[in-house]
């Protein structure tokens, strides 16, 4: 059920170029780094999508990047000018504070790649042992009467970040 096949972006780009139709790739979360070595299942990095040639790329400035809640549009100047000419643009453009915050988070990638300066990624990549210690610390603060009453325990599990951050 659901989606059973996916058309490669490169094929969609070829059709778009052939018929002069702009191709938009909506990444959802967006990340600048491959997160495989941190055991974080994520989509392709934005740079890999750029190489595939869509005219417009959309992704989140917050979810995986760790910046302020925002949407990022990567496109040619021509496409950006078309987008900016839409009257809705004024209502959805970022303010100066959001732009300054995005600049800081993007600079952290440029300077450090993956680092503890990026809270979102450092929390997602936190080792399981660290999470167990935190869980035990919190658990130890719960009165034993409540633990017994509600049948509370610390259990191993595997979950993924929500809100569409990860595929």
Language-model regions: role of each:
Residues 1-108, 142-143:
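Conserved PLP-enzyme active-site core in the AAT-like
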Residues 30-33, 122-126, 130, 141, ...:
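Active-site rim loops that border cofactor/substrate pockets in soluble metabolic enzymes
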Residues 37-40, 129-134, 162-167:
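Short glycine/threonine-rich loop-to-helix capping motif typified by GTGT followed
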Residues 59-61, 112-115, 159-167:
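Short, flexible, solvent-exposed loop/turn segments with mixed acidic/basic and small polar residues
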Residues 109-141:
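Structural signature of PLP-dependent enzymes
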């Amino acid at each position: 059920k659901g989606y059973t096949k996916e058309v490669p972006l490169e094929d969609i780009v070829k059709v778009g170029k052939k018929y002069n139709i702009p191709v938009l790739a909506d990444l959802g979360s967006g990340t600048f780094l491959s997160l495989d070595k941190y055991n974080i299942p994520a989509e392709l990095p934005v740079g890999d999508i750029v190489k595939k040639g869509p005219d417009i790329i959309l992704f989140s400035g917050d979810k995986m990047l760790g910046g302020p809640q925002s949407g990022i549009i990567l496109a040619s100047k021509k496409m950006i000018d078309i987008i900016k000419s839409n009257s809705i643009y004024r209502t959805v453009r970022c303010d100066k504070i959001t732009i300054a915050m995005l600049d800081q988070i993007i600079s952290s990638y440029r300077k450090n790649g993956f680092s503890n300066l990026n809270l979102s990624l450092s929390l997602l990549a936190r080792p399981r042992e660290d999470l167990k210690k935190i869980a035990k610390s919190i658990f130890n603060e719960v009165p034993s009467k409540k633990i017994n009453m509600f049948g509370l325990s610390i259990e191993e599990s595997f979950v993924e970040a929500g809100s569409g951050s990860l595929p």
